[in-house]
Design a protein with these regions (language model features):
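Extreme N-terminal starter segment of soluble prokaryotic enzymes
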Residues: 1-5
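Short polar catalytic/cofactor-binding loops
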Residues: 7-12
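Cys-nucleophile CN-hydrolase/nitrilase-fold catalytic domain and related Cys-dependent amidase chemistry
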Residues: 15, 23-97, 102
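Short secondary-structure boundary/capping elements
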Residues: 17, 57-60, 119-120, 144
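Short, acidic/polar
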Residues: 17-27, 143-150
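Structural motif
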Residues: 34-35, 135, 157
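Active-site catalytic loop in hydrolytic enzyme cores
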Residues: 83-153
Length: 159
């Protein structure tokens, strides 16, 4: 599988500027890309001001991801600060080339950064099947907890 991992300087808490910057980066990714991986909280930076930056159910950022996945005919994944059912989540979206998506809420919140004081931790382990691979979805600090990521034979790789 051809995977493109994008990294960029974030414009702090500026969704419009970050999407504009990533727009051209996604467009310029190699044509053979089958999966594009974006950074954690790519639209805002690792921002603890969730009241200001969190979007209901992914809002315009999820819409942007879906448009890009469809236009590129490839999957796109990254995390977004979202508000859902009165709580805030650091939510990973895995968007398929047809615009459908799966979600994973970060389980292990980064205490040293105060993430646990603002965001609600996820409770579900999510494995996504894409092409010939099964991906276990995880976000940053989750990797520090091997019991959570232990291979049960249900995935091929961790994103």
């Amino acid at each position: 599988m051809n995977i493109v991992v994008l990294q960029t300087d974030i414009c702090w808490a500026d969704i419009e500027a970050n999407l504009a910057k990533l727009d051209s980066m996604v467009d310029d990714a190699p044509a053979e890309a089958e999966l594009i991986v974006l950074p954690e909280m790519f639209s805002t930076g690792f921002c603890m001001d969730a009241e200001r930056v969190a979007l209901p159910d992914g809002g315009e950022v999820l819409s942007w991801m879906r448009r890009k996945a469809i236009a590129r005919s490839c999957a796109i994944t990254g995390t977004v600060a979202v508000s859902d059912a009165g709580c805030y989540f650091n939510r990973m979206y895995f968007v398929f080339p047809d615009g459908t998506y799966r979600t994973y809420d970060k389980r292990h919140l980064f205490t040293f950064g105060g993430e646990d004081k603002v965001y609600t931790c996820g409770t579900e382990r999510v494995v996504v099947k894409y092409k010939e691979f099964r991906f276990l979805l995880q976000v940053c600090y989750d990797l520090r907890f091997p019991v959570w990521s232990r291979c049960r034979g249900d995935y091929d790789a961790i994103i």
